Amino acid sequence: MEVLRLIRIFFVKIFILNIYNIVSNKKYKNIIYIINEFSRGYMNRGKNNKQSKKKNTKKREVDLFPALKNTVDGDRYGYINKDGEVIIPFKFTRAYDFNEFGLAIIKENNKFGLIDIKGNYNVNPQFDNINPYKEGRAIYTEKSKMGVLDEKGNKLRGVVYDYIGNYNDGYAVVAKMNGKSSKYGYIDLDGKEITEVKYMHANDFNDGFGLIKIKDREFALIDTQGNISNTYNFEYVGSYGEDLMVFSILLGGPYGYINRDGEIVISPIYCDAKGFNDGVAVVSRSNNNIICTHGVIDKLGRQIYGEIYSDIKHLGEGKIALGLPIGDNSIFPRSIYAIGDSLGTLLTKFIYLNIGMYINGLSYGSDDKKTFFLDRYGRIVKNLPMVDGSGELRAKGGIIHANIDYSPYYLDKNNKFIYQPNKEFPLDKKYSLIIDKYKPNINYLIYIPQVKGIHDENVEKEVNSKLRKISFYIPAKEEVIDNEPNIIEDQVLSYNYYGNFQILFYKDNSLIIDLLGYYYSLGAVNGTPIRKTCAIDLLTGRFYKLKDLFKSDTNWRAILNKIISGFIENDPSYEYVFPGSFKGISESQDFYIDKDNLYIYYPPYKIGPYSAGVITFKIPFTQIEDYLNSQGDFYKKFNG
């Protein structure tokens, strides 16, 4: 049997080399067909495999669920019951599941708090953030410090650190900063330090031990009493789990595995090695500069899956997602996945573009059109909902929660809607806004605002056409047909794009709306936020420009340039602006206004680093009142 397995691996490697050659000039669907034809026989060998099953812990029944409502003031969340009836009103800007203690994390007025099942505040919104409860504890952030909430929402007294990680195995990593350096340690569920906060680094507890770095080339495992179990003198030690750790003798690898006693179990031969999970680990020996391939080994270093995959993910419950490359991006390829088990059995064809974690024998997967439930063998569950779009599906409290294309909703098991967010909302009694979904490809999605109720149908058509055109983001080299990006449904894009909008201001036929987006090129360190602001007169359909705010016979550009240059030169909060990058106000300058101020803004990289985000200059109208056309339509409509 071992010989047959090695023969299969040999032919799989040959096959993948051929795939690399054809991926760039074959259509996406043809590639899927070739891969699946190859894997047809290989996958069938495990269908009768009897795998040990872990006992599932039944969770407490949940009877209230967070639900979204779209409004003129932005996203608002409340809670519904299993019948879709609203139990707690839509008043929060974020809302999360109720936990086993009957508490839910909510966000209101840009602060986080806790509510009970009646919607009453258990903890008033006061925190900058609250992490989801784990092991009966939630980590909060307040004024750049972190603390712990117990199961009743009470702060653990005296527990304040610069950093606290989520609890794992009853303990949490904590850190104190001293200048540019940090020291780490652990606290228990009561907030008591089990060891002094003095280590260079600390990892989450796992299987009763925490891995710490004492100093360079000295690592150790610490037990639940804070005692050092063993030390390890290597350049790197990490990813402790299932009694094994990744290690390297030299800085930057190669990597292998040691046991708790510090004995080398698997020699350091890998350029990349992950921790063990369900008895297996993901490794790579790839020296190919074009594409890094991965495989799976067991605790003896034996190959379970050969190093031929572009991506491998642990799915839990003994399942693994194995990805093969698709598309013409050979350095950072997308992957199409099959499901295998930790024994080396391929359970499915390579047909999934996304696969979720297994929980109680169920997962979910997506292809280029739909999302569906998967059973423990990776098969689509026919008697549970299948929905259009891509995202997540989970059984929750006897109903189905779907988060598809960034839109959360609920279904019953017969695929009937229990609750879904509204796709239209009123601006006032006259106008409403329709949320129009544009998704030509699984990796390109925009929600486009469309105005309804403009008296003149031609004006309405013109306004909506312009909003649609401005909403599109067209990357370099992308074709344009009829003012729309020419994106093909089964095209494998080398980027992701998501767009949405928010209303900044509405009053008496006057609308200011932000068209927002996020562009991410595969392999990039960061994506690029996209923002375009439109100020619209809904009576005439006019889109105002910055010049419309000022008197035409004044040198308003010069005064704005002077003010912004002053900010850059004298205000420490703008010290990150690239020297000499501000060239003055442009003809198509991005801006928006409120009742009292003008805001001039620049996207990341334009005049500052990505880390600065969108750089905005706030200019009070009182500072430029001599230049403002206070009798003009623009100013009067938005400030009259």
Residue spans for each PLM region:
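A short beta-strand motif characteristic of beta-propeller blades
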Residues: 86-90, 121-125, 155-159, 193-197, ...
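Positively charged N-terminal leader segments that act as targeting/secretion signals
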Residues: 1-4, 8-10
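Solenoidal tandem-repeat scaffolds enriched in leucines and small polar residues
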Residues: 146, 157, 162-176, 181-258, ...
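Short loop/turn segments that connect beta-strands within beta-propeller blades
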Residues: 82-83, 117-118, 151-152, 189-190, ...
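Repeated scaffold domains used in trafficking and secretory/extracellular systems
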Residues: 54-56, 92-100, 127-134, 161-168, ...
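Compositionally biased intrinsically disordered regions enriched in Thr/Gly
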Residues: 15, 42-44, 67-70, 74-78, ...
